[in-house]
Amino acid sequence: MSHTPVLAERILVADDDRTTRFAISSMLKKAGYAVTAAKDGAEALRNIQKKSFDLVFLDIWMPKLTGLEVLARVRAGESRPKIIIMTADGTPETLLRAIREQAYEYLSKPFPPKEAVEVAARALKQDASPRIEVISAQPHWVELLIPCTREAAERIHSFLMKLEADLPDDLRNTIGLAFKELLLNAVEWGGKLDPNRKVRIAQVRSSRMLLYRVADPGPGFSFKGLTHAAVGQPADEPIAHTNVRDQLGIRPGGFGITMIRAIADELLYNEAQNEVIFIKYLTASAGVSGTAEVPS
């Protein structure tokens, strides 16, 4: 994705590794941004307090102040630029603290410097959205209230998928597709893309299963009335919903519920069908490192 700033947006790059700091700063400068560099957390915080930045790339493990300490102090202050956390530390505790402190995105090192330009373009084109509320931030139980925007849904999907890094790639990607579709359905249809409304989501992990619960603020729905989805079509017209989606001007698709049903081991809706529980059982070979056992 290309992004040419009309006015040079200001970006701070903070990393104690000189090579990384130089590579990212250089790529961002070539893309037309006004870049300031900092070699440790204390210098990064001083820069943020003195100047107005649109975006900050922040390494976690830096001398004097860690990136997470800087993030917490920034959130308590008046200047609150969007912050991209970048680190090789992929532990659940670090990731969850980044979510709690309202990090905008989380980049896992190593990554190609050009990815910083793509992330910057994506972050800077988005308006500021309401806070993501953290209800629980334990590795085995994450529960959040997120604003009903596609941007928030995409961010949280990216964060939570990183929590499942111990799963095989194909399994994690498959589960991720289902969770993303549930989340987008919730913000689009239940929340009507109203950023002042919230979707409540929970991710629960034990050694034997991965569970997602998604509750949207809408009145619910009936499968019989889903003219815009493949699941609501007669057998002789399985893709009639595509015409409906064109007429309504909504994103291509409509196969989401059908796909989710195929992926889930259990899919449970409440009576109004504005809450859903997705369950995937994990085999011993799927990997369980870093998880917490749910007490029996």
Where are these regions (language model features)?
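Two-component/phosphorelay signaling modules centered on CheY-like receiver
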Residues: 18-36
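Acidic catalytic/metal-coordinating carboxylates
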Residues: 39-43, 66-69
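C-terminal output helix
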Residues: 93, 111-120
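Active-site beta3 strand of CheY-like receiver
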Residues: 51-57
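Alpha4 helix (beta4-alpha4-beta5 surface) of REC/receiver domains from two-component response regulators
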Residues: 69, 90-105
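Conserved beta-strand-loop-beta-strand hairpin that lines the nucleotide-binding pocket
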Residues: 117, 121, 134-142, 187-296
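Receiver (REC) domain active-site loop signature in two-component systems and cognate sites
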Residues: 62
